[in-house]
Structures are given as C-alpha cells and as structure tokens.
C-alpha cells in the first residue's frame, strides 16, 4: 500500500527507513545527503517535519536525534516498536486512502464535493481517482463518477477489499470502527462452533475481525 503515499510522504519514509536500517539505527549526514540525493536544508526540514509528525501521530516511542559531534542522525525507538506504525500513519493520511475510506460510508453528488471532503484540489481528486481505478479494476471494483461519486462492485469483493485495506493501514495499532468494539467481535466469534471459526494465528484472527466488522456495517 505504499503506492498510496504522496511524494512528500514517500520522501519522509525513505529517510526514516534509511536511518532505521542502518547499523544501530544511525546514519551519517553525508550518507543521507548522497543516498537520498537531497540538500542539507531539505534534510534538516524533513527531519524536523518527521519528528513533528511522529509526535502528532502519538508515537512517543520514536524520534530522530542529531549528534552534532559525529554529524549523524539516530532513530530512537523503544523495544517491541515497529517503524511500520509510522509508515501506516502516513498511509492513512494519504489522499488515496482518505478517498477510499470516505467512499466506504458515503457517496457524493460530484467530484467537487468529494474533493472538499478530503481536502484535495479538483485536479488532484481526478488524478487520484484515475490511479485508484487502475488498481480497483483488478478487483472488479471501481470509483464511479457518473451520476454520483461512489465505489461500485459486488458486495463480497468490496468487503474483502476494505477488510484487507483497513487491516494493513491500521494493523494492530488501533481499531478503525466506532460502531463495534474489537472485543465484541471476539466474543461473537468465540461463541461459534470450532467447525466455523478457528483462528490458528494472530494475523488470521485479526483479518477475520476486520471482515466481520465490514459485514456489520
């Protein structure tokens, strides 16, 4: 789902991963400038923005710190935390994801109304929908812009697509559905006979929870 990221977020993620996968989560200033092909002012402003974003996302376990004597940057990260949490947060804020999430629950009379809802320009919304439709057609889905703007396709394909979309974007970090709690679905599933429901892994259990939530919408 990284293809959903806009260009600015892609550059932030590239910088984050460059530092994260370096030895001891530390990269020198020279490595970052050369490998990412950016200028020093861009490096400084991007790191400042990333740290602001991380705080805004609520992930206090992460931060990029600068070591002046060594001219290096280190990603401070708590144990058992994954950089994927930050990447997922950027994905959730991307125009493409915002469009898909918005169209799950509502249709719009025209593109202008949708563009206003997701805070994208009219030309931008047309571009994003065109690119999304290239992906959606492979799943027999599409965003229709005829009489109204809506996502169309058979119900089963829609539910599978959104269950997977939300599972990847939200993962185990948070639960995106306000109308039902995760533990309520757990109770429901545990009351089912083992012939119907048996989760052999955490990933499988989470996927089933998201799929059930989509059916309850």
Indicate residue ranges for each PLM-predicted region.
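A cross-family "folded-core" feature that marks the main globular domain of proteins
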Residues: 1-217
């Amino acid at each position: 789902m990284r293809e959903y990221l806009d260009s600015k977020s892609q550059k932030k993620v590239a910088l984050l991963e460059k530092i994260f996968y370096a030895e001891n989560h530390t990269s020198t200033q020279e490595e970052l400038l050369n490998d990412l092909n950016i200028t020093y002012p861009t490096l400084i402003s991007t790191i400042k923005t990333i740290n602001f974003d991380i705080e805004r996302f609520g992930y206090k376990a992460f931060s990029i710190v600068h070591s002046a004597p060594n001219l290096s940057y280190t990603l401070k990260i708590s144990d058992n935390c994954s950089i994927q949490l930050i990447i997922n947060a950027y994905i959730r804020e991307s125009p493409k994801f915002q469009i898909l999430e918005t169209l799950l629950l509502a249709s719009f009379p025209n593109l202008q109304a949708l563009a206003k809802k997701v805070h994208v320009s009219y030309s931008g919304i047309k571009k994003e929908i065109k690119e999304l439709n290239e992906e959606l057609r492979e799943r027999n889905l599409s965003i229709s812009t005829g009489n109204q703007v809506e996502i169309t396709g058979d119900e089963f394909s829609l539910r599978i697509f959104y269950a997977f979309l939300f599972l990847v974007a939200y993962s185990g970090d948070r639960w995106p559905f306000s109308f039902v709690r995760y533990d309520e679905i757990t109770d429901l599933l545990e009351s089912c006979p083992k012939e119907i429901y048996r989760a052999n892994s955490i990933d499988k259990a989470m996927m089933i929870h998201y799929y059930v939530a989509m059916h309850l919408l």
